[in-house]
Amino acid sequence: MSLLPYALARPFLFGLDPETAHELTMASLARTQGTLLSAAYCSSKVSDPIELAGLKFSNRVGLAAGLDKNARCIDGLAAMGFGFVEVGTVTPKAQPGNPKPRMFRLPEANALINRLGFNNDGLDAFLANVRKSAVRQKNAKNALLLGLNIGKNAATPIENAVDDYLICLDGVYPHADYVTVNISSPNTKNLRALQSDEALDALLGRIAERRETLAGRHGKRVPIFVKIAPDLDDAQVAVIATTLKRHAMDGVVATNTTLSRDAVKGLRHAEEAGGLSGAPVLEASNRVIGQLRAALGKGFPIIGVGGVMSGLDAVSKIKAGADVVQIYTGLIYKGPALVAEAANSIKNSR
């Protein structure tokens, strides 16, 4: 979608409830992908390849998980010029998420607050959608590097969370270019407790063991990334970095949404519960990225996400220590033109 059509569509979309606007956009994208109408969303892809974790990224800008929770729009999203796309978060069983309203715009801050709670159609429906996407077929002309993001059901006790992650890992493994283990959403009760020292060590130990089994079964070793929060102190980041390396994780996604409201105090909806995304997260996310890079060294892949609203923001993530970046809230505020803007800015910054 070019800048002008999105500029025309945005007032209409922003006149709707945020979740209604999201559902309408995704339904439209799902219906039109692969047709002439999908040209409205298309953007020429910037070529800026990089290899990370044995994967070849066609450029340095990807879509963050959360926009396409059910993998319904993979083909349409691929046409926007992303170097990679991450879909999910998927849980073993379908679940409705938290009560509505659960998504709020803070336009003065180019931000969103959501407390969706991993609403999704479940693993079986998710995998069916992945399998039928055109860009995932063998010998597809426009093959897409695809990440599949996994989580736990809200009804699963936190002490049994590993069971949900293993169920999802078993299911997504044959279909993923990489898998992201989401332990940082603030909208599933106690989920972030999995970032603590002992809990993370136990979880990643089990995931690493299962990955070895799956690698033997499927004849390929799929990289595993772990998505963490921005609301971590220096000591917590250091422990996470050590644990990632101990269990031979392949990369880290930094970061998820924040619980902090320091940057949006006094704004309408600022006190709504949930995770804050968009421009106010940029600084906190970059801080964590920098700490991770210092702790992990040069060769460990970092996907930077949080607050990318412009090409300059994308470059700031790379300078902080990320190898590639992801966008989500920026796409809502700026439209699909942000993909090429960010990718070109990164390419031209070197």
Curated annotation (Swiss-Prot):
Pathway: Pyrimidine metabolism; UMP biosynthesis via de novo pathway; orotate from (S)-dihydroorotate (quinone route): step 1/1. SUPFAM superfamilies: FMN-linked oxidoreductases. Binds 1 FMN per subunit. CDD domains: DHOD_2_like. It catalyses: (S)-dihydroorotate + a quinone = orotate + a quinol. InterPro entries: Aldolase_TIM (IPR013785), DHO_dehydrogenase (IPR050074), Dihydroorotate_DH_1_2 (IPR012135), Dihydroorotate_DH_2 (IPR005719), Dihydroorotate_DH_cat (IPR005720), Dihydroorotate_DH_CS (IPR001295). This is Dihydroorotate dehydrogenase (quinone). The active site is at residue 185. FMN binds at residues 65-69, 89, 149, 182, 227, 255, 278, 307, 328-329. Catalyzes the conversion of dihydroorotate to orotate with quinone as electron acceptor. Coiled coil: none annotated. Substrate binds at residues 69, 114-118, 182, 187, 256-257. Pfam families: DHO_dh. GO terms for cellular component: cytoplasm; plasma membrane. Gene3D superfamilies: Aldolase class I. It comes from Polaromonas naphthalenivorans (strain CJ2).
